Amino acid sequence: MEQLVYIALLGALGCLCRYFLSGLVYQVFGTSFPYGTLAVNLIGAFLIGLVMEFSVRSAAIPPTLRFAITIGFLGGLTTFSTFSFETFRLLEDGALLIAFVNVLVSVVACLTCTWIGIMVARAL
């Protein structure tokens, strides 16, 4: 039960971070492309690579904390559902190129960020 509380608390924190970070990104870059969603997903992809690799190589992050961070915080921070909805809206609006770029950049860049997070954790 205690683990669920930690996951819920960090999940709420992740959601708030997503709200504020994506809002800030949209203020800076505008809304012609899903920049805010891409930004939070890139950050989350880097962090999950870092946290998971570091926790596998070290006992510094106990499983309870690892679950709270990955399932809770990063689950709240990142959003596949918003990515899907925004991409669908782009397709629906006839912005096929922007939708394609969003999918391509999101997948390739998120995988790259995860890899970078893993490499950083291995270097620590």
Swiss-Prot record:
One of its GO terms (biological process) is cellular detoxification of fluoride. Keywords: Cell inner membrane, Cell membrane, Ion channel, Ion transport, Membrane, Metal-binding, Sodium, Transmembrane, Transmembrane helix, Transport. The chain crosses the membrane at residues 5-25, 32-52, 67-87, 96-116. GO terms for cellular component: plasma membrane. InterPro entries: FluC (IPR003691). Belongs to the fluoride channel Fluc/FEX (TC 1.A.43) family. This is Fluoride-specific ion channel FluC.
